[in-house]
Every structure is written in structure tokens, then in C-alpha cells.
Amino acid sequence: MRRVKLLCTALMLLASHGALAVSYPLPPEGSRLVG
């Protein structure tokens, strides 16, 4: 179970970093599409 929790945490971190990297340079419309 610990490994699954670790995987979920890593995925969440990757997703949040990816969303930030994608939505930062885009205009509000683009970030609204992503989020």
C-alpha cells in the first residue's frame, strides 16, 4: 500500500508541475482551457 501511495503522490506532483508549466506562458483563455 505504501508503494501505491508513493506513486499517487508522485503523479500528483508531476501533474501539478505540468499544469503550472503549461498554463504559465499561456493567456487566460489557454489556462482556462487547461484548468
Curated annotation (Swiss-Prot):
Its EC number is 2.-.-.-. Its main location: periplasm. One of its GO terms (biological process) is regulation of cell shape. Belongs to the YkuD family. Pathway: Cell wall biogenesis; peptidoglycan biosynthesis. Disulfide bonds: none annotated. One of its GO terms (cellular component) is periplasmic space. The keyword DNA-binding does not apply. This is Probable L,D-transpeptidase ErfK/SrfK. Keywords: Cell shape, Cell wall biogenesis/degradation, Glycosyltransferase, Hydrolase, Peptidoglycan synthesis, Periplasm, Signal, Transferase. GO terms for molecular function: glycosyltransferase activity; hydrolase activity. The lineage of its organism: Bacteria, Pseudomonadati, Pseudomonadota, Gammaproteobacteria, Enterobacterales. It is found in: Periplasm. Residues 1-21 form the signal peptide.
